[in-house]
């Protein structure tokens, strides 16, 4: 694409030796589709927004983690108090003898799975390392770059230790109710979600959990689940031959007419229009 926005190294790194730095987004505003001359890790702390990565939409909120390669196209829209940090790095500048490919999905041809989640424990540990990394990356002493790279190595190992698939919180996890709830919602794309049954199983207050969820994400539980389902529907409309009625079932809508109403309200176009427009842009 001739007019593709490309973020340049010289606008983010202080010199050609610096391998890693941190870009805060407090908050992250709407940002047009772009690629980079560098790679990045995206860590979402709170709020919500629509993250479109290589034309696939993700409704993001606290705990979402993305591994972005230089060539990946992504954008942010529909943001609501979205707070995140980008840890940006140049693979060719890294000097530490670390098996980066084993730590970072997609690193220089490694198998790429871009979207993961961190629970509260992993987020707390990652935040501590990122704060130190940000301090060093802004430093001017002779060892600042080396210290920043050491901390980057610690960060990617911390993320690998604590990350989990969006719908698969480990059974042995000691994560919070909020982490368990978001995982349960990710597992409810095709079927109804019963919050009362979840709260009974976890022995918690439904009212308190609703309040906590809204405080951390900026959405109600139902709003979040609806947005996640619509994102999944957008992806299926673009990348699968399924009929719209089949897609509505796979996204938790038993009535395809109701699905069309909700989809149109959320995206501004009907499912058929979305599919047609997406096929035209391919």
Swiss-Prot record:
Keywords from the UniProt entry: Activator, Cytoplasm, DNA-binding, Repeat, Rhamnose metabolism, Transcription, Transcription regulation
SMART domains registered for this protein in UniProt: HTH_ARAC
Gene Ontology molecular function terms on file: DNA-binding transcription factor activity; sequence-specific DNA binding
One GO CC term, this protein: cytoplasm
Superkingdom in the source lineage: Bacteria
SUPFAM superfamilies cross-referenced by the UniProt entry: Homeodomain-like (SSF46689), RmlC-like cupins (SSF51182)
Main location: cytoplasm
InterPro entries from the UniProt entry: AraC-bd, Homeodomain-like_sf, HTH_AraC, HTH_AraC-typ_CS, RhaR_RhaS-like_N, RmlC-like_jellyroll, RmlC_Cupin_sf, Tscrpt_act_RhaR
Cross-referenced PROSITE patterns: HTH_ARAC_FAMILY_1 (PS00041), HTH_ARAC_FAMILY_2 (PS01124)
GO BP, sorted A to Z: positive regulation of DNA-templated transcription; rhamnose metabolic process
Residues in HTH araC/xylS-type domain copies: 179-277
Pfam families: AraC_binding (PF02311), HTH_18 (PF12833)
Subunit note: Binds DNA as a dimer.
Function: Activates expression of the rhaSR operon in response to L-rhamnose.
Protein name, entry field: HTH-type transcriptional activator RhaR
Originating organism: Salmonella schwarzengrund (strain CVM19633)
């Amino acid at each position: 694409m001739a007019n593709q926005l490309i973020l340049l190294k010289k606008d983010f790194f202080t010199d050609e030796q610096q391998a890693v730095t941190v870009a805060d987004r407090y908050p992250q505003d709407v940002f047009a589709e772009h690629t980079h001359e560098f790679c990045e890790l995206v860590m979402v702390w709170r709020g919500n927004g629509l993250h479109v990565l290589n034309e696939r939409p993700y409704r993001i909120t606290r705990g979402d983690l993305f591994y972005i390669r230089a060539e990946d196209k992504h954008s942010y829209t529909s943001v609501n108090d979205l707070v995140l940090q980008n840890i940006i790095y140049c693979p060719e500048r890294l000097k530490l003898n670390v098996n980066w490919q084993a730590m970072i999905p997609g690193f220089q041809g490694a198998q790429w799975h871009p979207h993961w989640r961190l629970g509260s424990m992993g987020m707390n540990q990652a935040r501590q390392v990122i704060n130190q990394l940000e301090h060093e990356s802004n430093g001017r002493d002779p060892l600042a770059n080396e210290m920043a790279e050491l901390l980057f190595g610690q960060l990617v190992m911390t993320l690998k230790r604590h990350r989990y698939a969006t719908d698969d919180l480990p059974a042995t996890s000691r994560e919070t109710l909020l982490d368990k709830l978001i995982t349960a919602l990710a597992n409810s794309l095709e079927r109804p979600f019963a919050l009362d049954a979840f709260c009974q199983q976890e022995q918690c207050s439904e009212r308190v959990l609703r309040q906590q969820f809204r405080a951390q994400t900026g959405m109600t539980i139902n709003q979040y689940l609806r947005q996640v389902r619509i994102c999944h529907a957008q992806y299926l409309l673009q990348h699968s031959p399924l009929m719209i009625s089949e897609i509505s079932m796979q996204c938790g809508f038993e009535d395809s007419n109701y699905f069309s109403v909700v989809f149109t309200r959320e995206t501004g176009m009907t499912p058929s229009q979305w599919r047609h427009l997406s096929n035209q842009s391919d």
